[in-house]
């Protein structure tokens, strides 16, 4: 009985140590949100000019496997049409933040249109790499 108790306590101790272990430290400093915003703005402006390939080619392979540059462009154009078109000579409101319950970094572009706001989100991983 004593050996069984020691065995159970030993197993409990191992599980406790594993559960209380600190997370592995991040592999570097937090990414520069200004640099991320600038990169995302460049992608956004390219898409505004009709170049969806550059953004698509920068996406992770797993995302590229499930979507195409044409699909991104079609979705963009459908949304613009639904909102009554984009106003001429306008610049988006741009914000960069970490959404609640997420560790991603989001750059949000908003252009007020006739029938609502045209919104584009470009997400980055915590290490600063393009996510989607």
Regions found by a protein language model. Give the residues of each.
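C-terminal motif of bacterial Sec signal peptides marking the signal peptidase cleavage site
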Residues: 15-19
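Primarily extracytoplasmic ectodomains and periplasmic/lumenal surface modules that are beta-strand-rich
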Residues: 52-53, 129
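Hydrophobic residues positioned within well-ordered beta-strands of beta-sheet architectures
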Residues: 107-109, 120
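Short beta-strand edge/turn micro-motifs at domain boundaries
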Residues: 117-132
């Amino acid at each position: 009985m004593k050996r069984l108790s020691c065995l159970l306590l030993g197993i409990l101790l191992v599980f406790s140590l594993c559960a209380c272990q600190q997370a592995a430290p991040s592999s570097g400093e937090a990414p520069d949100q200004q640099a991320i915003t600038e990169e995302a703005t460049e992608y956004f402006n390219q898409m505004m000019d009709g170049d969806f390939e550059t953004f698509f080619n920068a996406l992770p392979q797993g995302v590229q496997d499930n979507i195409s540059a044409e699909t991104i462009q079609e979705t963009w154009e459908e949304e613009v049409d639904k909102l009554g078109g984009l106003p001429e000579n306008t610049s988006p409101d741009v914000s960069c933040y970490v959404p609640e319950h997420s560790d991603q970094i989001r750059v949000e572009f908003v252009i007020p249109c006739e029938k609502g706001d045209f919104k584009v989100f470009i997400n980055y991983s915590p290490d600063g790499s393009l996510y989607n």
